[in-house]
Amino acid sequence: MNGLYLGIDTSCYTTSIACVEEKSIVLDERTVLSVPLGGRGLRQSDGLFQHNRNLPALLKRLYASVNPKRIAGVGVSAAPTGAEQSYMPVFLAGILTAEAIAGALSVPLVRTTHQRGHLRAAMYGGNETLLEKARFLALHVSGGTTDVLEVTPGNGLIETVRPLGCSTDLHAGQMVDRLGVVLGLPFPAGKHLEMLAGDAEEKDIRLPSSVRGTSCSLSGAESQAQRLLQGGAPAAEVAYAVYDCLARTLVKLIHNAAQETGCDTALVSGGVASSLLLRRLVGQRNRFGLEIRYGESRLSSDNAVGVAFDAKESLCSRKP
């Protein structure tokens, strides 16, 4: 199928649309949801309201840049992950918009997941060669997910995503955001906490990294970081320790998953993975010689680029 493919993603953090063609990104538009200072996120009803308010403006930009008649298919994140009970009301805004556009244009609609979108976005560029592998590991590290996955490509697309493990309590992004809120940083706090960590003069604080097999626990590390801040520890040094803890945790998870599956490559995706500091620390802590890949930093945070590519590849694989 030649033409353009539209992707729509309405997550807990961002309203996103994207348009792709072959292997290139034609359009990538996003609006971050507004969270009051001091807040730890939005209620689903508030997020849904903001998506409905944001989508018309984003679609106006789409139609100003792209001839709708060139759109050959539409993809939408219909759920957070592929798990059977995975559901969040915020995705309804994207689903209804995608259904309306696909119906008006008489083009097929592909329902995918937010997680698959992240994985596919992280493959954009040089990592698309992973689709040629028999299997590879993936980590989806964000405010709502800290998942260890085994991905099986097939027929030029992501065929299956098998969960191997996860965080048993806090997600990595939650840990970052909670400490950021305590420090008075805007939500989501990732880029602000990373900037603060860059000011650390001493790097001796070591938060516990709790990993069992392919699952982890971050609540203990978060509690200790909170106590350190309450005790007067320098904020920048605690911020650095958070990223160091996450780096050690991710390396352990990848190593254990590699031992379990025999996969030799891991792709790290999700908003937390956009941190250049985290990437550097993971490289320093990777004493196992693991091949750890990342997507472009701009495509690690919530976006619809991966959703659009996933839809394109799904539809093209159906061609007779």
Predicted feature descriptions by range:
Residues 118-121, 295-320:
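Glycine-rich phosphate-binding/hydrolytic loop that grips phosphoryl groups
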Residues 2-26, 135-152:
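Gly/Thr-rich phosphate-binding beta-strand-loop-beta motif of the actin/hexokinase/Hsp70
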Residues 1-3, 107, 111-136, 310:
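Conserved phosphate-binding catalytic cores of ATP/NTP-utilizing and phosphoryl-transfer enzymes
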Residues 116, 152-201, 228-232:
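Glycine-rich phosphate-binding loop plus the immediately following alpha-helix
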Residues 60-99, 103:
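Short beta-strand-loop/turn "lid" adjacent to the catalytic site in phosphate-handling enzymes
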Residues 11-49, 157-163, 294:
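Short glycine-rich, Thr/Ser-proximal phosphate-binding strand/loop in the N-terminal lobe
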Residues 191-266, 272-283, 287-290, 312-319:
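A contiguous, well-structured pocket-lining segment that forms one wall/lid of small-molecule binding clefts
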Residues 68-79, 261-272, 293:
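Short glycine-rich phosphate-binding loop at a beta-alpha junction
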